[in-house]
Amino acid sequence: MSLQQKIKAYLKLGKLGVVSLLDLAAIAGAFLAYKHGISLLPIIPMLIGGTLASMGAMIINSGIEINRDKVMSRTSNRPTVVGYVSRKEVIVVGSLLAVLGTALGFIDNALTAFFIALGVIIYVFVYTILLKPRTWLNIVIGGFAGSAAAWAGYTSLTNSLTLEAFLLGFLIFMWTPGHFWSLALKYREDYINAHYPMLPAVVGITTSARAIATSNALMIPIVLLMGYYISLIALIVFSVLSALLLFLSYRLILNPTKEEAMKSFIFSNIYLMLILLSIIIIKLI
């Protein structure tokens, strides 16, 4: 296997799509803390470190879950499953990236490094190893990994946490279950075959649709409070986006199908992305 193919395999295992959203959360966290006159240079080591650590966590995850990935259609073509890279190799490489990423956080401060490491620990040990194979609450508690990214961004500029930082982290935590349950509903049979107790594999499609809608609805007050805290413009933007999310959630309840679940999943990605981008843009104005 050539070096180029090896790099391509690791980029796939590193889940750049997921990592890019975590990076956006970290950048939004940093800009939430930004005040005119403060240097933005600390964002650079935090972002590089967070990216490497997040990719490392994803890569370790692929090594741990290789046997279950083999029976899931969505993951059956991963480089670990088809034999491009071994379990031992990915765990070593992933661990090195996680350690290097955490070390880069120390360039800013110890608190930033702590939150980078916390994201890895929650995703690998709490979510992947402890909770995912055992309880449908896996993704609920695992959502704190995304919160850690936002907090790492915030502390890179402040070396402290405030109410607004906690709100952003809690927003991401509340967003996570509805988002991933939508994907799990689409691939429900995969999770059943792999014996993962993801909520849609445990309670069925109709109940899952209601749980997704309920989770999204419970998140909205946090989003609106966040918008109110930032500015009137943010509150208006967040309200419009939240109305669209609630509309799609209502449609999913009325028509609990995999197609509607996928629409909910795609829009929830867009929803969080626009929320985070709005924070960055508004704080720059």
From Swiss-Prot:
Stated name of the protein: Protoheme IX farnesyltransferase
EC number: 2.5.1.141
InterPro entries in the record: Protohaem_IX_farnesylTrfase, UbiA_prenyltransferase, UbiA_sf
Family under the similarity heading: Belongs to the UbiA prenyltransferase family. Protoheme IX farnesyltransferase subfamily.
Membrane topology recorded in Swiss-Prot or TrEMBL: Multi-pass membrane protein
Biological processes annotated in GO: heme biosynthetic process; heme O biosynthetic process
Xref: NCBIfam families: cyoE_ctaB
GO MF, one example: protoheme IX farnesyltransferase activity
Catalytic reactions of this protein: heme b + (2E,6E)-farnesyl diphosphate + H2O = Fe(II)-heme o + diphosphate
Transmembrane segments: 13-33, 40-60, 90-110, 111-131, 137-157, 165-185, 198-220, 230-252, 265-285
